[in-house]
């Protein structure tokens, strides 16, 4: 038995790590598998202070994001992507081997992975689906019943991997009836959504946390910058377990520039283009055997097919990557397709038509 096998924490023996799009798939010239933006925008970086450690929390960055979100800067915590925010919440609120979090599958995989990494239990309350498009919604009654034994409740809206937004009345019902649980609403895709954010509810609900990111609509997945929005006492607690230098200085510089007025105007234009492209792709794929699983409020589409693995392999062999979601509860033979540039989408449409011809 190796030294690692002897000394590792026992629960990690059974842990399956999160299979990110970049980790699980490689190669390809067209990447439509990670819900990234096709835009690569230009920024400037001052390298004169790269010999110095960055701030624990950048006041200019947190202030800029607070203004963007319409809240006070004291309610903002910047982190290495929203994934770090997920981990911080579990570390700060959950006792290993004792507490649980609640998730609503099919949903983003990092909620469960982060919990299991720290020996925290995971309670699943699946989304309700009547079989109709865009009808995946919260089972509020079951969530409220289970919340008594769960420290943290993770809700993803708009949903990844489904794409649709959760009913805000249902989210508020969970908040109202789960006052002893932290209710986390992951709004990674909110810039694409026609629905309302719940950020304005922070004043009303001391147990509400909202996760945000610059990885999607802001087209900055490569700088790893996310935000956790919550009331001051939650922010103060999370700062106790946050790494001393969470964001590199170049990340902070770029993020601040991305939140300036001119950059936000560019973001709105790019989002509008991507939404138009999404609708164009959806219309084109109506001519194929693919079945839309859920109406999208994001920059991706979710489709059922006869053989997801075969379809993904065929496209991969032709240097085009999409994501197989078959491992998710209720999504057997389902693929997720990120909306790319017009040229990338044209290639996608053509390859899918060729595959099904």
Curated annotation (Swiss-Prot):
Pfam families: Aminotran_1_2 (PF00155). It comes from the Bacteria. Disulfide bonds: none annotated. GO terms for molecular function: histidinol-phosphate transaminase activity; pyridoxal phosphate binding. InterPro entries: Aminotrans_II_pyridoxalP_BS, Aminotransferase_I/II_large, HisP_aminotrans, PyrdxlP-dep_Trfase, PyrdxlP-dep_Trfase_major, PyrdxlP-dep_Trfase_small. GO terms for biological process: L-histidine biosynthetic process. It catalyses: L-histidinol phosphate + 2-oxoglutarate = 3-(imidazol-4-yl)-2-oxopropyl phosphate + L-glutamate. The keyword Amino-acid biosynthesis applies. Homodimer. Belongs to the class-II pyridoxal-phosphate-dependent aminotransferase family. Histidinol-phosphate aminotransferase subfamily. This is Histidinol-phosphate aminotransferase 2. It comes from Idiomarina loihiensis (strain ATCC BAA-735 / DSM 15497 / L2-TR).
């Amino acid at each position: 038995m190796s030294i690692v096998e002897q000394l590792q924490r026992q629960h990690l023996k059974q842990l399956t790590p999160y299979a990110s799009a970049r980790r699980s798939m490689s190669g390809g010239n067209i990447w439509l598998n990670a819900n990234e933006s096709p835009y690569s925008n230009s920024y400037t970086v001052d390298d004169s202070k790269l010999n110095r450690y960055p701030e624990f929390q950048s006041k200019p960055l947190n202030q800029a994001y607070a203004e963007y979100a319409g809240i006070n800067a004291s309610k903002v915590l910047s982190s290495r992507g929203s994934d770090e925010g997920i981990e911080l919440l579990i570390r700060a609120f959950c006792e290993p081997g004792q507490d649980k979090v609640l998730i609503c599958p099919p949903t983003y995989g990092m909620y469960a992975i982060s919990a299991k990494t720290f020996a925290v239990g995971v309670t699943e309350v699946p989304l309700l689906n009547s079989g109709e498009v865009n009808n995946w919604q919260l089972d509020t009654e079951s969530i409220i019943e289970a919340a008594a034994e769960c420290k943290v409740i993770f809700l993803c809206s708009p949903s990844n991997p489904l794409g649709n937004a959760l009913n805000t009345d249902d989210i508020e019902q969970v908040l109202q009836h789960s006052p002893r649980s932290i209710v986390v609403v992951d709004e990674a895709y909110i810039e694409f959504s026609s629905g309302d954010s719940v950020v304005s509810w922070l004043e009303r609900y001391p147990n509400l946390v909202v996760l945000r990111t610059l990885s999607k609509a802001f087209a900055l997945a490569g700088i790893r910058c996310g935000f956790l929005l919550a009331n001051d006492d939650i922010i103060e607690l999370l700062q106790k377990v946050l790494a001393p230098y969470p964001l590199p200085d170049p990340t902070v510089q770029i993020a601040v520039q991305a939140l300036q007025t001119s950059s936000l105007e560019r973001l709105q234009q790019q989002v509008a283009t991507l939404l138009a492209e999404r609708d164009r792709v959806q219309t084109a794929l109506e001519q194929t055997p693919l079945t839309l699983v859920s109406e999208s409020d994001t920059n991706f589409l979710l489709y059922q097919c006869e053989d997801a693995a075969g379809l993904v392999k065929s496209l991969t062999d032709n240097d085009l990557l999409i994501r197989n979601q078959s491992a998710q509860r209720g999504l057997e033979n389902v693929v997720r397709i990120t909306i790319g540039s017009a040229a990338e989408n044209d290639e996608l449409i053509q390859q899918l038509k060729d595959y099904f011809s």
